[in-house]
């Protein structure tokens, strides 16, 4: 897992071990339940792990922060972030049960005590979180409409509570109506 060490120094031995185990665990699970495309599994560390960790370049979550990962799929960005921030609580949700089974299996194998995974839709939730993370599960305006009531008002991190949304491509059209309310970070 040299690629993670290249961009994130100061990781503990435990974190390094967990990151090193990721590829093998996902390959094993992907044989049973296809959650990552067969051609993409070879680029897991760059396309999924590092992409997820881009959030850690924007914010270093403080201990006790509660993060909701919406549409987590196989556990991205939630699992890599949970390794990076072991004192932060991560709640990973997806509407597809087989994906949650993978998340539970990977989190369990890694010994991640800070991860809870559930099969449910975010619009049915009542709990509030400091941050909501996602990897572009829908158009940004629709995502905001689904999640905005799940964000706590009082912030204690260096960045105000809100949505951290990973998305590639041309995002300008989707965020046009939010220009005065958001910050865009490019990695």
Language model feature labels by segment:
Residues 26, 81, 167:
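Residue-level signal for inorganic ion chemistry
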Residues 28, 32, 45-63:
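Conserved alpha-helix/loop element of class I SAM-dependent methyltransferases that forms part
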Residues 74-87:
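Conserved SAM-binding loop of SAM-dependent methyltransferases across substrates and taxa
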Residues 87, 91, 95-187:
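S-adenosylmethionine
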Residues 1-38, 42:
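N-terminal auxiliary segments of SAM/dcSAM-dependent transferases
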Residues 63-73:
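Conserved class I S-adenosyl-L-methionine
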């Amino acid at each position: 897992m040299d690629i993670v060490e290249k961009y994130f120094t100061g990781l503990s031995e435990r974190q390094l071990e967990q990151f090193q185990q990721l590829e093998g665990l996902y390959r094993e699970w992907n044989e049973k339940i296809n959650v990552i495309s067969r051609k993409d599994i070879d680029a897991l560390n760059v396309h999924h792990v590092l992409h997820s960790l881009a959030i850690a370049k924007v914010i270093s979550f403080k201990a006790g922060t509660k993060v909701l990962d919406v549409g987590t799929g196989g556990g991205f960005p939630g699992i890599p972030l949970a390794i990076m921030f072991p004192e932060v609580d991560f709640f990973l949700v997806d509407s597809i049960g087989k994906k949650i089974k993978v998340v539970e299996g990977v989190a369990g194998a890694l010994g991640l005590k800070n991860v809870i995974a559930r099969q449910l839709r975010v619009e049915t939730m009542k709990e509030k979180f400091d941050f909501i993370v996602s990897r572009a599960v829908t158009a940004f305006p629709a995502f905001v409409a689904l999640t905005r009531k799940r964000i706590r008002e009082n912030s204690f991190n260096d960045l105000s509570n809100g949505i951290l949304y990973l998305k590639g491509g041309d995002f300008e059209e989707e965020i046009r109506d939010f220009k005065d309310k958001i910050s865009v970070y490019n990695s």
